[in-house]
Curated annotation (Swiss-Prot):
Keyword tags: Cell membrane, Iron, Membrane, Transmembrane, Transmembrane helix, Transport
Gene: isdF
Gene Ontology biological process terms from the UniProt entry: siderophore-dependent iron import into cell
PANTHER family hit by this protein: FERRIC ENTEROBACTIN TRANSPORT SYSTEM PERMEASE PROTEIN, HEME-IRON TRANSPORT SYSTEM PERMEASE PROTEIN ISDF-RELATED
Membrane association type: Multi-pass membrane protein
Protein name: Probable heme-iron transport system permease protein IsdF
GO MF terms, alphabetically ordered: transmembrane transporter activity
Disulfide-bonded cysteines: none
Family classification: Belongs to the binding-protein-dependent transport system permease family. FecCD subfamily.
Induction conditions: Repressed by fur in the presence of iron.
Subcellular location: Cell membrane
Length: 322
């Protein structure tokens, strides 16, 4: 009981930190806001500075929160589905496949912009299925599976590089220049994906069982691995549709959360949601304040943090002979 209470208290503290960070992000930038500006806006309904920030900065903050949460949860789900602690959508090529589909859709069927998350999901599904088929045939260990994923990532990024030589297929990536329609599109996918994940989290711990144990209790482990993998691909692909590729969030956050609260997915999923949202928001905030008026992409900061962590996890997996 005491451990449960500690986890609840920690979760509430993280929520407070997340809200505080969102507020700091909202008032910080080339246009700075004071508390008086906000007070004037909410009492009189009129403040030009606040109005401009609501249109320019608030969509960016909301998208950062949703994308961070979705990528963190996607990473946790992929690791459960593939039984691989190194799995992450960007590393195994899912994000690249989704980005190629996004580019093709924007060129040939731009009128379907509001369906980009679903169309990107189709693109992200292809490399995931390739990984599954190859793994079922060759039974890769954790590191070998990641190497195959990296090969797919390189291949698909090469295809993407060729496609984007066409000026009509240039893809804006990152959190800049986001508008409210982007928020609405992503919010639908975020709500759907995260609600389904919370429902599925009741069964995720059983994915650690082997096939014999699962069958002995009547649990269809293959079906749930597929459902978990598909949901992970959907969450990651939906973020790609709006912000492009963001590296390593899906591998950093689940491992940090496991260190904090253990591997129970009923606890891991909510914590990953909050910490993932906070981490991307912090990366975006740092990118805006380190060298103003220039902006460092949040993805660059994530890569600086995530690269060493991936090396550490690979070394650890080799040591444990995963």
């Amino acid at each position: 009981m005491m451990i449960k209470n500690k986890k609840k208290l920690l979760f509430l503290c993280l929520l407070v930190i997340l809200i505080a960070t969102a507020y700091i992000s909202f008032v910080t930038g080339t246009i700075k806001l004071s508390f008086n500006d906000l007070f004037t806006k909410f009492t009189t309904g009129s403040n030009e500075a606040v109005d401009s920030i609501i249109d320019l900065r608030l969509p960016r903050i909301l998208i950062a929160l949703m994308v961070g949460a979705m990528l963190a949860v996607s990473g946790a789900l992929l690791q459960a589905a593939l039984q691989n602690p190194l799995a992450e959508a960007n590393i195994i090529g899912v994000s690249s496949g989704a980005l190629i589909m996004r580019a093709l859709c924007m060129l040939f069927i731009p009128q379907l912009y509001f369906y980009l998350p679903l169309l990107s999901f189709i693109g992200g599904l292809i490399p995931f299925l390739i990984i599954i088929v190859l793994h079922s045939k060759f039974r890769f260990n954790a590191v070998s599976m990641i190497l195959v994923g990296v090969a797919l990532f390189v291949l698909l990024n090469g295809v993407l590089e060729i496609l984007t030589q066409n000026p009509l297929m240039k893809i804006p990536q990152g959190l800049t220049m986001k508008i409210w329609s982007d928020v609405y599109i992503l919010a639908v996918s975020a709500l759907l994906g995260l609600i389904l994940t919370l429902l599925l989290s009741l069964k995720l711990n059983l994915l650690n069982l082997d096939d014999v144990q699962a069958r002995s209790i009547g649990f269809n482990i293959d079906r749930y691995r597929w459902l978990t993998g598909l949901l992970a691909v959907f969450l990651a692909s939906a973020t790609v549709a709006i912000v492009g590729q963001l590296a390593f969030l899906g591998i950093i956050v689940p491992h940090v959360v496991r260190k904090l609260v253990g591997g129970n997915y009923r606890v891991l999923i909510p914590f990953s949601t909050v910490i993932g949202a906070w981490l991307l928001l912090v990366a975006d905030l740092l990118g805006r304040v380190i060298q103003p008026p220039l902006e460092i992409p949040a993805n660059a900061i994530l890569m600086i943090v995530g690269g060493p962590m991936l090396i550490y996890l690979i070394c650890q997996s080799q040591r444990n002979r995963i």
